[in-house]
Structures are given as C-alpha cells and as structure tokens.
Amino acid sequence: MIQQETRLKVADNSGAREVLTIKVLGGSGRKTANIGDVIVCTVKQATPGGVVKKGEVVKAVIVRTKSGARRSDGSYISFDENACVIIRDDKSPRGTRIFGPVARELRENNFMKIVSLAPEVI
C-alpha cells in the first residue's frame, strides 16, 4: 500500500528515476493506494536530458507494490519494490518504454497502453 510521502521507483523512460507521493487520488480523505491507482507525485531524482525534470509535479499509476494485492480468485500478488509509471491526464504513459513486470490489475483499470508496452504482465 502506498500513502503520502512514500518514495517509488519509476518503471519507464520518461526521465524520472524516483518520485515522492504527494496525494492519493480518488475520494476525499483517501489514505492508501494499491496497484492500478493514480497518485500525484513530485520527481525527486531525474536523469539528465529526460522529458520529466526534478521538482516537477506529475501523475503516476502504481504498477508494483511490496505489500501484495488480493485477487478475486483468492491469490495474492506482491513484488520486490514499489514502482509506478508517469502518465498524462488521458491515462497514456509519458515514456515510450516500460521496465519490469506489471500487474494484471492495470488491464481492469483501462491502462491498456502500459500493459501493451510492458515486457511481462503477471
């Protein structure tokens, strides 16, 4: 589960390497987010020459979490790290590549472009 002040790795080539969560979107007073939820972040580390600069406020969707997500068949899925993909307002990714696996829950939340770019969907 991701909450305010959580740092996440960025799993795309938008230029950001690490972001800090500012707000969890979706309802007033919502405290935590899980895989497939949209968050507002600020960029803490960025690569030189990238599309996204350090200090920029961006929206991102969570693609991997250490604390697992429960699926409808009763199984749980968890990853080794917390990671997100930076998105535009129309839910399309700002980068052109996705690194590492992403969860199948993104397909249910209509992030089809991220699912199609990902090397592996778990």
Curated annotation (Swiss-Prot):
InterPro entries, sorted: Ribosomal_uL14, Ribosomal_uL14_bac-type, Ribosomal_uL14_CS, Ribosomal_uL14_sf
One GO cellular component term noted in the UniProt record for this chain: cytosolic large ribosomal subunit
Disulfide-bonded cysteines: none
Cited PROSITE patterns: RIBOSOMAL_L14 (PS00049)
GO biological process: translation
UniProt KW Plastid keyword: no
Domain of life: Bacteria
Keywords: Ribonucleoprotein, Ribosomal protein, RNA-binding, rRNA-binding
Function: Binds to 23S rRNA. Forms part of two intersubunit bridges in the 70S ribosome.
NCBIfam families found in the cross-reference section: rplN_bact
PANTHER family with a match to the protein in the record: 50S/60S RIBOSOMAL PROTEIN L14/L23, LARGE RIBOSOMAL SUBUNIT PROTEIN UL14M
Family designation: Belongs to the universal ribosomal protein uL14 family.
Name the UniProt record assigns to this protein: Large ribosomal subunit protein uL14
Organism of origin: Bacillus subtilis (strain 168)
Lineage: Bacteria, Bacillati, Bacillota, Bacilli, Bacillales
